[in-house]
């Protein structure tokens, strides 16, 4: 198994206090709390933000609309919000590299690591443009984040080439169906942080945490480190990946049941399920339960 130090970060659009409470129940070690979505007063969510910082690695982000965010105020108001958020001592803050406030935020960030980001939700520019973006972000940020939209798989390769190309740790991947593979490849190439959905996707092609864990495990990638913390995280990955695959199997069983029913064919396939049980080996009891669940799903399809 290959160990990588990638930080799996659940992205949370924070509108109300309950959004933070729910996120803290998720099996992820990092939370990006998107406060550009905030509908409540900051004072109302502040205690929960402090609690989140104490329990998880936390990124505070107030994304402007030009780069896919929901912030409706001016830059002066956004800078003021970042100042208040920095009082909570987050591990990271994310500010767009092209934002006029990034220089001031960099001066007051304290111990927080500044992620200087750049997003293009429409296309993937040529490599020379991407390289310029990365260099400019590296000049002000502790980490670089470059995310574009892939219209074809080759677009994703250009973005991935930024990882390791500048002197700062670089997060780089592509959005959209054609770029979905880059979200997994980036982890293998050394991206320090990767982002997953905890229910509500905030970007095209964003994978759920469970789907992402399944993909990493399929490639033999496991959490880095040793001792109980690493083992607990590894177990979260396995549990999440297993739940994702079981849900997918039930969905396929349901679709098969409907098609067979419409065609007048026997709904339940004993031969196929017997093959599954033979392959299950030591996990036969678990898969017997899965088989029975699939049988029930097909019968009611």
UniProtKB/Swiss-Prot annotation:
User: GO molecular-function annotation terms?
Assistant: 3-dehydroquinate dehydratase activity; chorismate mutase activity
Q: What is its EC number?
A: 4.2.1.10
Q: Where is this region: 3-dehydroquinate dehydratase?
A: 1-221
Q: Which PROSITE patterns match?
A: CHORISMATE_MUT_2
Q: Which residues bind 3-dehydroquinate?
A: 32-34, 63, 183, 202, 206
InterPro entries in the cross-refs: Aldolase_TIM, Chorismate_II_sf, CM_dom_sf, CM_II_prokaryot, DHquinase_I, Type-I_3-dehydroquinase
Give any Pfam family that matches: CM_2
- Where the record annotates domain Chorismate mutase, the positions are 222-301
Which cysteine residues pair off into disulfide bonds? none
Q: Which domain of life is it from?
A: Archaea
Keywords, in A-Z order:
Amino-acid biosynthesis, Aromatic amino acid biosynthesis, Lyase, Schiff base
**What is the reaction catalyzed?**
3-dehydroquinate = 3-dehydroshikimate + H2O
Pathway of action: Metabolic intermediate biosynthesis; chorismate biosynthesis; chorismate from D-erythrose 4-phosphate and phosphoenolpyruvate: step 3/7
User: A GO BP term, please?
Assistant: chorismate biosynthetic process
Q: Where is the active site?
A: 119 (proton donor/acceptor), 145 (schiff-base intermediate with substrate)
What this protein is reported to do is described as:
Involved in the third step of the chorismate pathway, which leads to the biosynthesis of aromatic amino acids. Catalyzes the cis-dehydration of 3-dehydroquinate (DHQ) and introduces the first double bond of the aromatic ring to yield 3-dehydroshikimate.
What do we know about how this protein assembles, alone or with others? Homodimer.
- Membership in a protein family: Belongs to the type-I 3-dehydroquinase family.
Name of the protein in question? 3-dehydroquinate dehydratase
Gene designation per UniProt? aroD
